[in-house]
Amino acid sequence: MHYVIVNADDFGNSEGINRGIIAAHEQGIVTSTSLMVNTPATAAAVKLARAYPNLGLGLHVNLTGEGERRVDLEDRQAVKRELEEQFNRFVDLTGQLPTHLDSHQHVHREFNVGHLFIKLSLRYGLPLRGYSEVVYNSRFYGQWEYGKTEERYISVEFLISLLKAAKRGITEIACHPGYVVAEFNPVYNWEREVELKALTNPRVKSVIEEEGIQLINYQDYLRRAEVA
């Protein structure tokens, strides 16, 4: 059996991103999202999450802003404090543990601080993106070299190719859907609407059925692990 988690990053980063993620869940194939707890639309995201209990909710640790370091990654103690604070804030806001851990701009993969994320994930028995049996696929993204937009990598055809290439076991495909809003203009912006169109395209759903892929979230994955 092929199991696929489709996780939308940046929940809480803006109202437009929040609405896009919910649309990708309701109308498309997104099964999971990662909440940022220190961004302008965090409270709105938490409220939305309560209305969609089947949408898995993880923690998207944000140690960076849009291109800015919020914490000096060379200061391990500062990173540890911020990591703990964001984890505790997630629990306070949602009343539950996150289903999984990942991070904005993949800072948890940086050598100097990665072990701090690993320790936190082990303490609570939570999957950490790229450090579990779940195969992580980051290729569905519309900017690569020097911030250049590559729309072909967020097309319906490319998404279908990623789904067809998913091996037996569990794969996570990361995505960043959203709606463009005037008050929020990040580096990665209009590409989010292109992603949203692909994630909600009927052809994509048809391929999932044809390939025998079962869409799950990290909570489903943890339940499977407990049974095994």
Task: Describe the function of each predicted region.
Residues 16-40:
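A short alpha/beta connector and helix-capping loop motif
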Residues 21-27, 42-58, 90-94, 163-167:
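Acidic (Asp/Glu)-rich catalytic clusters
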Residues 186-228:
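C-terminal domain-boundary segment and adjacent tail
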Residues 87-164:
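Catalytic domains of cell-wall/extracellular-matrix polysaccharide-remodeling enzymes
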Residues 66-89:
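Glycine/small-residue-rich loop that forms an oxyanion/phosphate-binding "nest" at active or ligand-binding sites
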Residues 1-15:
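Boundary/entry segment of secreted carbohydrate-active catalytic domains
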Residues 9-11, 36-38, 60-66, 104-106, ...:
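Active-site beta-loop-alpha junctions enriched in small/polar residues
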Residues 3-5, 30-34, 54-60, 98-102, ...:
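Structural preference for beta-strand elements that scaffold enzyme active sites
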